């Protein structure tokens, strides 16, 4: 997993350094948008998992109380 992370960082650095300033600026802007989307998706997934755990816990408590 770490290998892929380093590979992505290396590719991004090479692309930014090899491109002209205008292209690099546009690429960085696009890349930052992509990173924000990924972070948002991870955050939403964590919230859904937490909500699911709360619902499952509540259901287990109800079953234990009635059972």
From Swiss-Prot:
Function in brief:
Has antimicrobial activity against most Gram-positive and Gram-negative bacteria, filamentous fungi and yeasts tested. Has trypanolytic effect on T.b.rhodesiense and limited hemolytic activity against bovine red blood cells.
Cellular compartment(s): Secreted
Q: Name one GO cellular component term.
A: extracellular region
Q: What is this protein called?
A: Stomoxyn
Where mainly located?
Answer: secreted
Instruction: Report the residues modified as Threonine amide.
Output: 66
* Keywords tagged on the record: Amidation, Antibiotic, Antimicrobial, Fungicide, Immunity, Innate immunity, Secreted, Signal
Q: Which GO terms describe its biological process?
A: defense response to bacterium; defense response to fungus; innate immune response; killing of cells of another organism; xenobiotic metabolic process
Could you say which residues form the signal peptide? 1-24
User: What InterPro entries does its record include?
Assistant: Stomoxyn (IPR021037)
Q: Which organism is it from?
A: Stomoxys calcitrans (Stable fly)
Determine if Zinc-finger is one of this entry's keywords.
no
Q: Which Gene3D superfamilies match?
A: 6.10.250.280
**Where in the body, by tissue, does this protein show up?**
Constitutively expressed in the adult anterior midgut; proventriculus, thoracic and reservoir regions.
- One of this protein's Pfam families, by short name? Stomoxyn
